[in-house]
Design a protein with these regions (language model features):
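Conserved alpha-helical scaffold segments that buttress catalytic/binding sites
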Residues: 1-148
Length: 148
């Protein structure tokens, strides 16, 4: 779980946990996973940590069924005030958007159109301070110049 360091979980690298002005950087209530399929995309340890720390999840089915509604649900879970959106491209269906670092998501995950609807809802929120994107590998789509 990449968030282990920000949450200061046991086993996280101290040099990453102590990197910022407060330790841990995030509390579990500061985090909502939107569009995650816990049964496919996570390890037993990650699922255990998410359950133990009660990290909120608006799952992949909810996102695919109603992208804007799922985004609104995720936003309601967070406290009012500023928030950031982090997009891990690995959640996308790799066949629809071959831009992920991890190529195992073939025919699984939301399409780029579904993701766009959810992101549109979140990015229009006046309390949204920023967007970060991770796991993007344009080389995987080098034959398709329209992929990005």
């Amino acid at each position: 779980m990449g968030m282990a360091h920000a949450l200061g979980l046991e086993g996280a690298a101290p040099e990453l946990v102590d990197l910022m002005y407060r330790t841990p950087l995030l509390q579990p209530s500061d985090l909502v996973y939107l569009g995650v399929d816990l049964s496919r995309e996570t390890t037993d340890w990650e699922r255990g940590q998410a359950a133990e720390h009660r990290i909120a999840v608006v799952d992949q089915t909810a996102l695919c069924d109603d992208p804007r509604g799922a985004a609104a649900d995720a936003r309601r879970i967070l406290a009012s005030g500023p928030f950031l959106v982090h997009l891990d491209v690995d959640v996308l269906d790799f066949l629809d958007a071959p831009i992920a670092e991890n190529v195992n998501g073939r025919n699984s995950g939301p399409t780029i159109a579904i993701l766009g609807q959810a992101l549109g809802a979140l990015l229009q929120d006046p309390d949204r301070w920023g967007l970060s994107i991770g796991q993007l590998d344009p080389a995987h789509a080098s034959a398709d110049r329209t992929a990005i």
